[in-house]
Amino acid sequence: MFEKAFTLAALAALVCPALCAEWLTDFEAARQKAAAEHKPIIMDFTGSDWCGACMHLHSTVFEKPEFDAFVKDRFVLLEIDCPHGDKMPEEEKARNEALVTRYAVRAFPTVLVLAPNGDVTGGFLGSGFSMEKIQQELQQGLDNFARLEHAQSLAGQEKLKALGEFYNALNNDARPCAVSLEEQIIQADPQDTLGFAHRRQVEQQRQQIKKRTLMLMQRRDPQEIMATVEELKPTVMPENMHMLLEMKMTGSVLAAQSEDDLAKLRDSLQAELDTLPDSPEKAETASQLKATFSDIPHLFYQVKAVRARKAQEEKLMQ
């Protein structure tokens, strides 16, 4: 029995290299192989010693025969591991961390489909998907590879328009990672006829406001919050005014002295929100406003509790 099991294990070890998908670990080597074979790359950002979702994705998808059969002759596979431990040489770890920055990776696992030149053509975040769903996303990235090649083959305004349409058609997981393609479009469009430069400015300001908001929430000082609102108001782009309104809502709620103050504040904020142009962000702010003021007595109770806790913290620090 032991000899039979040993023989089967040995046979599997011999057969697997020929059948199992090969994952490269060097970005430039993967690009060269993809260019030589005219294939897109599947690039998996993983954390092999800490990311449970990454391990789940590997065990339930990447290590399955169905996945091997799907990617065979279609893709070059590339694993970018970002371990927390010291099992990886520092030089390789630095290269991988640079790729995390280059592709604006914001969650693990992130799986991207790339053209051989490194441009993003598709991808997905997370691990809670079926094999069928993942194959659909990867197939979309493969199909987009051909579309991107066509767009790159054009010239002038026709090329610019095609690249813009390609970028906008990327799914919500892949689009933020397509930093290089976005930069190509911006550089080719100095008059910003497609609005990409403006959109980037809006997003950059949005991230700056988020950082300020996080710091303000830690201190929970209504006067500081309202002062920040006044400071930012002259420079905030119209697309980001909803964020200023949310900040104002937080500061004003913390400053409220009665339930009547909160009721008046609700009406004032709603009137201000009504002046903003319709957008998905405005709709989210409207939902947040409604939820915040849905139970004013309970909200005022929470405000008093925050004040009491803050006063206690300040007393302990004296």
Model-derived features: positions:
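Short domain-boundary/entry signatures in modular proteins, especially
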Residues: Q136-S153, Q205, I209
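Loop/turn elements at helix/coil->beta-strand transitions in domains of secreted/extracellular proteins
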Residues: E37-I41, D73-E79, R106-P109, P116-D119
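Extracytoplasmic/secreted cell-surface and envelope-processing proteins
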Residues: C51-C54, K87, T121-G122
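Non-catalytic, surface beta->alpha helical segment in thiol-disulfide oxidoreductase systems
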Residues: T60, A98, R102-A146
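Local sequence-structure signature of Cys/Sec-based thiol-disulfide redox active-site neighborhoods
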Residues: T25-F67
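Thiol-based oxidoreductase modules, predominantly thioredoxin-like and allied folds used
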Residues: A21-T25, G47, T60-A94
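Sec-dependent N-terminal signal peptides
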Residues: F2-V15
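Oxidative protein folding and maturation machinery
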Residues: L154-Q318
